[in-house]
């Protein structure tokens, strides 16, 4: 039996996640290992959730991106 074709919503999330990962690696000075560790660590600014736990919605992905923006520009509050 064939796998179902990915619906539009899923492909949008996949694209946003891909862009987020690329951005995150840049924020962590192209050190992918550091970025991957950060993704698995609970973060205060994300309500003590891990960034990777929020990647199931557009809103969650945007929250993680906002957090990365704060890291990039030194505004960790």
Task: Report the location of each language-model feature.
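Non-transmembrane "mature" sequence context
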Residues: 1-77
